[in-house]
Amino acid sequence: MPGGLEALRALPLLLFLSYACLGPGCQALRVEGGPPSLTVNLGEEARLTCENNGRNPNITWWFSLQSNITWPPVPLGPGQGTTGQLFFPEVNKNHRGLYWCQVIENNILKRSCGTYLRVRNPVPRPFLDMGEGTKNRIITAEGIILLFCAVVPGTLLLFRKRWQNEKFGVDMPDDYEDENLYEGLNLDDCSMYEDISRGLQGTYQDVGNLHIGDAQLEKP
C-alpha cells in the first residue's frame, strides 16, 4: 500500500510542525492581570511582577496617581528579569499609586490591568505578643495554681486541727466531766424551782378526762 507508507513517512514531519507551533514562538503574547492591590507597611519592601508568556519581552513599568487624573502617567523604566520585577527596598508615602506594566515583543504591545500600591502605618505591636496557644497554656497554668492555693492551705489546716485534737485529747469523751455537769448549781434554787413547778400543776385540769356530770371547774 503506497498510500499508507507515504502517510507514515509524513507523520514525523507533522509532529515536528505541531510541536513548533505549540511553542512560545507560535503562541500569542499574553500578560497576566496581576493583583488589583498590594498593601505594604511603611518602611517595608514591595515587589511587583509582570507575568507574561514572552520569550524575550521588553517590559516597561508605568506609574500614575489615582487621585490626580490630570497628571499623566510616568514611565519608571524596565523591570528585572523575564517577569519584569519592580522592587522597592523601602516604601514611603510617595510610592502610593497605580502601577502597570507594558510588554512589547515582535511589535506586539500588551498591558496589565494594574496594581494599586497601598502604604499604611505599621500596626503597633502589643505588649505581650503571644499566640493563642501560648495564651491558653498560661490560662491553664493560672487555673492550676489557683486550685493549688485554694486546696493546699485548707488541707493543711484540717491536718493541723486533727493533729491538735489527737495531741491534746479534745475529741475524747470524758465521763467524769459529764457526771459533774451540774456541780456548780445551787441546790436551794433547784428545790425552789421544783416547788413552783409542782404548785402550777394543780391549777388547770384536763377537761377531756372528766365526766360531764362530775365536771367542777375551779374558779380563777
Curated annotation (Swiss-Prot):
The modification Asymmetric dimethylarginine is found at residue 198. GO terms for molecular function: identical protein binding; transmembrane signaling receptor activity. Pfam families: ig, ITAM. It comes from the Eukaryota. Heterodimer of alpha and beta chains; disulfide-linked. Part of the B-cell antigen receptor complex where the alpha/beta chain heterodimer is non-covalently associated with an antigen-specific membrane-bound surface immunoglobulin of two heavy chains and two light chains. Interacts through its phosphorylated ITAM domain with the SH2 domains of SYK which stimulates SYK autophosphorylation and activation. The transmembrane helices of CD79A and CD79B chains and two IgM heavy chains assembly in a four-helix bundle structure that appears to be conserved among different BCR isotypes. This is B-cell antigen receptor complex-associated protein alpha chain.
